[in-house]
Amino acid sequence: GINIMKKPAIITALFAILIICCQCTMKSPEKEAVNHNYMWFDCEANYATLSHPDSIRFYLQKTKDLGFGNVVVDMKSIMGEVLYDSQIAPYMGDWEGVERSRDYDMLGYFIEYGHEMGLKVFGSLNVFAGGHNFFNRGIIYNEHPEWQSIVYRPDGSLVPISEIKTNYNGMLNPSNPEVREYQKNILVEFAERYPDADGIIFDRLRYDNITSDFSPLSREQFEAWSGITVENYPEDI
């Protein structure tokens, strides 16, 4: 047993050890606070406003003042047109009467001014989007109509997505190897052009929804993958 005369000394020693342990825990290295607030700059809604470097600086400062630490800049629209001088994709050089020259480097200004203010700047790309059905504009209307999704309608019909004017998204068929190769080349080009961007965000990296794609190509791919011949297409899907 413990001698009763030694108990106060033991209790004091244990209490001292407890205090030291607590202090060690409290003195863990401080971590830099991470700002998870993102401001998204849509390329169509802000086309006119962001066509001037001083406007970009102005709204970046307002963004920072509001407590945001990150900005996302749309650089490839749902039409498949890009907002930088690409050697692959068509350039979005105008929108609703406002024009831009190909040498206008919008994201370059965002990166320069944003980094000066301590903001992180990300570029956003709409990957499998290729047309704006409300404006009949985009690569599915011009360069590559054969790449658009085929939609299975409630009435049983199969319709190109460009003909569905209640849906503004003119989506491509992600299962088409030509589409995937084309998009991959754009992503590589973009990453190499903007190495100082803090990251790339992929938007619409998907099918339009469960009603697409029902093209002959997708049917062939499904049957090859599953080993099943679909006798009643698309009813049995």
Please give the residue ranges for each predicted region.
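Bacterial N-terminal signal peptides
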Residues: 12-21
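Bacterial Sec-dependent signal peptides at the C-terminal "C-region" and cleavage site
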Residues: 20-33
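Active-site-adjacent "subsite" loops/lids of carbohydrate-active enzymes
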Residues: 32-50, 123, 128-194
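Hydrophobic faces of well-ordered beta-strands that scaffold small-molecule active sites
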Residues: 37-41, 71-73, 121-123, 200-202
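Aromatic- and glycine-enriched glycan-recognition loops and surfaces
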Residues: 48-66, 93-116, 181, 185
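Catalytic domains of carbohydrate-active enzymes, especially glycoside hydrolases
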Residues: 55-81, 195
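Aromatic-lined substrate-binding rim segments of carbohydrate-active enzymes
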Residues: 78-126, 237
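Aromatic- and acidic-residue-enriched segments that line the glycan-binding/catalytic groove
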Residues: 83-95, 129-165, 204-236
